[in-house]
């Protein structure tokens, strides 16, 4: 039975500091490292052992994958990195303190920027100190200046359909180590969650989420591996 494992990266430094992160490359905290290791230990204990891995271009997701795979004795499996699994781009909010933004713009406006389905934050201006456009990992990529969840879905789902789903359909156990919003995009699709309801879905850091697929590649109900 094809099995999909979704893992949001462990706590990052900007998660800890309550800052908008998006495409900026931020490392894991010590807690984030431990969360990633614990995810791998759980995979091993439950016997849910990945055979193929996918992750983003961002360090926090890549490290989470490697730390988890090491704990599960699966560092040797093939892995693919792709920018389309990156976090949602938070535009001009990148690097800013979330509470300071609430104080400045009000809770409602910040909630709309963070959680609405199709309203993106303000664009990132050229020369912004956290502009990832000059990063060599994005050579040849048309880096967005901002993204809503809807726009994030529009890059994640074609990648899922063309690159990940065929691997899963061949019978592999696939692990995807990614980000809160790129994983929300997948969960919305796989679980048939409405545009309205997806805004309330939280993906916790370092907690493996499992989908099992039937012979017609229809996913069952998602569940947290720790609860199985």
Swiss-Prot record:
Residues the record marks as site: Transition state stabilizer: 179
Pathway info: Carbohydrate degradation; glycolysis; pyruvate from D-glyceraldehyde 3-phosphate: step 3/5
EC number(s) reported in the record: 5.4.2.11
Binding site residues for substrate: 8-15, 21-22, 60, 87-90, 98, 114-115, 180-181
Catalytic residues of the enzyme: 9 (tele-phosphohistidine intermediate), 87 (proton donor/acceptor)
InterPro entries according to UniProt: His_Pase_superF_clade-1, His_PPase_superfam, PG/BPGM_mutase_AS, Phosphogly_mut1
Example of a GO MF term: phosphoglycerate mutase activity
Keywords: Gluconeogenesis, Glycolysis, Isomerase
Matches recorded under SMART domains: PGAM
Annotated catalysed reactions: (2R)-2-phosphoglycerate = (2R)-3-phosphoglycerate
PROSITE patterns the UniProt entry points to: PG_MUTASE (PS00175)
Pfam families for this protein: His_Phos_1
GO annotation terms (biological process): gluconeogenesis; glycolytic process
Assembly: Homodimer.
Family as reported in the entry's similarity comment: Belongs to the phosphoglycerate mutase family. BPG-dependent PGAM subfamily.
Function: Catalyzes the interconversion of 2-phosphoglycerate and 3-phosphoglycerate.
UniProt-recorded name of the protein: 2,3-bisphosphoglycerate-dependent phosphoglycerate mutase
Gene (name only): gpmA
